């Protein structure tokens, strides 16, 4: 494990040198001591040819070079446009999660181990050539004994140790960034990596994806808007997922959609309707709706139906978040900025002591230029993004569910405008939101709320008792976990080795080498 970590560290070091990412880091407002420490790096004493690439391109190429786990991390970062400069976010959005397939014998062995039977007994036909291959899994076509055409998704073998290793380095870099820079602390890098850790391990559990797909299918059962393939539960395990095979037109294949006379305006509007239905009716939305996961049914082009696959990432909102979000959007389009500011404070998204007048003025400054455009040119996703960026200046806590929502909305909106450039998102969404708000205050909804609250009454005394016990019980002092220390010690070992190499080089000064050795010894021996 430690040998793997050292090899991985050296690989990261080579990529940093190749794409001159240290120069990129020095563009940040680093403290003096960290900027001075950067001169201890051996490669900074050697002549280097400047790269004719933008900083975003260098970062994207470096992540692609480091492999699938870093690629997926870059893809996650690209959705955090509230944190990143636009040029870097745009480049990271170009990252492609395409890797060579792993051998068919490994896929078959894993399927047979997970399902406890030979593939020949499980399927009438199993295609050894995968339909698609990505960093986490690959997909094979097959046919069940009963005749149904299916796809078999298989998790890539040996991923977990590599993921844990890469996450350890990402956490280390995030902690160093938080300690070194106030600007970095504002971006909460440790929280971003934690979010990625949850996402990547969720994607490794195909039973979770199967459950998500089943729920989404049930939510839209019989709907003309969205179709979700059937899951074959008796053939699903943590590393194997078997689903109905679908046949549709990729949503980006505009030529084929036009050839079959698809109603593009209705298709674009239905995409928006699906999004708002998932968010507000179901509070359960597909949060990975990029074009590769969306198809269009060929059955009824005059009344087009979407097909969604890959339900590994799902978002949900609490009742309170749904309510505040709907009221925020309605207030935005009425240009009631004071209400928007007050809703953010009431929801707890920004601190309670935030000055409403100042927050209102900041929102107005950002949003007024947007509303000078025609409604069809206004981006809902960009509106939310600008709002998050403004709220960040007022210490808005990161809301993971809202980040997923904003990312999904940007995808749906971009897709809708690609299908039908004159799509007026607000005209499509407004009736839905206003109807949903009316239903929230209907007598039937209020009665349901009363019933739910009445069910909690018998448990109130136990809840109060548990709360008092927690207050009386002192929290044990936190101890540093030794597992969190080993990346620092490995980094120290690398510094010692690099310092020794530099000290032996006759063309370079030796004082940086001694400092590197000293710093490395400190990291290795510290408790």
From Swiss-Prot:
KW Membrane (keyword) present: yes
Pathway info: Cofactor biosynthesis; ubiquinone biosynthesis [regulation]
Pfam name, any one: ABC1
Full protein name: Probable protein kinase UbiB
HAMAP family assigned: UbiB
InterPro entries: ABC1_dom (IPR004147), Kinase-like_dom_sf (IPR011009), UbiB (IPR010232), UbiB_bact (IPR045308), UbiB_kinase (IPR050154)
Protein residues bound to ATP: 131-139, 153
Transmembrane segments: 23-43, 504-524
NCBIfam families according to UniProt: PRK04750.1, UbiB
Superkingdom of the source species: Bacteria
Organism: Ectopseudomonas mendocina (strain ymp)
Main location: membrane
GO molecular function terms noted in the UniProt entry: ATP binding; protein kinase activity
Residue ranges occupied by any Protein kinase domain in the UniProt entry: 125-488
